[in-house]
């Protein structure tokens, strides 16, 4: 009987871990992969946590949402409000992407909730996407204890570039080997 209880406990633990760290999902609209991480973190911690993840050789970053289709896709991934990579911490009122290929770019597409962004109490510099797909400015510096999950985006190296990098690496290896053989 105790072996059955141990097995059930192990399976329950695996289930909890798997739900918090799901396999990233591919979105054909961007060619990227996305992952909702339900770990409860501060807005400023979410960026570092996303960068600590990788998938298919690509380093993660907080999701950048460039159109309504991508917004809908991400909305369907999340089960609670989640941090995305949009911030005006650098320049108040200038909402720009903090990571990924769009880092530093001003947001051209937004889906703010009515009355947002409002910089409530002069301190909402980060963006959460809600389960209805609308966005809210929130987080640090004013709300120092506001925590929730985040959406990680992965931009894998395109296949042709991967093959080119492999070819360059093989050529370099061949050159070094040839140079080494001629010395001996």
Residue ranges of predicted features:
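A short, hydrophobic C-terminal helix/tail in secreted or cell-surface proteins
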Residues: 158-177
């Amino acid at each position: 009987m105790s072996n059955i209880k141990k097995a059930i406990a192990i399976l329950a633990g695996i289930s909890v871990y798997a739900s918090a760290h799901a396999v990233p999902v591919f979105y054909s609209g961007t060619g990227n992969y996305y992952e909702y991480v339900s770990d409860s973190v501060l807005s400023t911690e979410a960026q570092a946590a996303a960068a600590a993840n990788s998938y298919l050789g690509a380093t993660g970053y907080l999701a950048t949402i460039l159109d309504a289709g991508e917004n809908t896709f991400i909305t369907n991934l999340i089960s609670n409000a989640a941090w995305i990579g949009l911030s005006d911490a650098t320049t108040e009122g200038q909402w720009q992407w903090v990571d990924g290929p769009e880092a530093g770019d001003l947001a051209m597409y937004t889906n703010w909730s009515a009355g947002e962004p409002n910089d409530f109490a002069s301190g909402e510099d980060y963006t959460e996407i809600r389960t209805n797909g609308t966005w809210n400015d929130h987080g640090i510096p004013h709300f120092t204890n506001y925590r929730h999950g985040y959406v990680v985006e992965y931009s894998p190296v395109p296949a042709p570039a991967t093959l080119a990098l492999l070819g360059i690496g093989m050529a370099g290896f061949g050159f070094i080997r040839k140079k080494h053989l001629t010395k001996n």
